[in-house]
Amino acid sequence: MNYFDNKIDQFATYLQKRNNLDHIQFLQVRLGMQVLAKNIGKLIVMYTIAYILNIFIFTLITNISFYLIRRYAHGAHAPSSFWCYIESITLFIVLPLLVLHFHINETLMMFLALISVGVVIKYAPAATKKKPIPARLVKQKRYFSIIISTILFIITLFVKEPYTQFIQLGIIIQAITLLPIYYSKED
């Protein structure tokens, strides 16, 4: 175990004793803290690379656009923490760099973003085997996914370049994670 795992175990044990948690609740709390710590670590790595490459704001815009939709739309996940790092760097560092340096046609990006909103409308929310969506929440998550992706698309009609393309990129990336091609592989 590393330093952070030890600290997480200590804090989870403290919470277990303080709140009279049973063993299952203790494991859930510990897992939640481990996931949070890993995600914070990934964000630090990703944003540090973006800062070094002088694309911090573009990575941030892309990531926020992606996350605002993903929160409700869900979608495919990387098969492991390692692949999550690789995918995060590819999607939120490499793709923004490509959009920035190759000056992707505005009309093409607008068209792809519009198609992506259609994908969100058709497939959101997309549950996974590891992250099922309770039936009572599906309708609400679908509604918010559609509303948020539509609002983000409308915002791109009024925001100046290059920021528009990074909002659109976030919409496109999230829509791709909703496509059914990922779900046969995941199961």
Curated annotation (Swiss-Prot):
Essential for the production of a quorum sensing system signal molecule, the autoinducing peptide (AIP). This quorum sensing system is responsible for the regulation of the expression of virulence factor genes. Involved in the proteolytic processing of AgrD, the precursor of AIP. This is Accessory gene regulator protein B. The lineage of its organism: Bacteria, Bacillati, Bacillota, Bacilli, Bacillales. GO terms for cellular component: plasma membrane. It comes from Staphylococcus aureus (strain MW2). It is a multi-pass membrane protein. HAMAP family: AgrB. It is found in: Cell membrane. It is an enzyme of class 3 (hydrolase). One of its GO terms (molecular function) is peptidase activity.
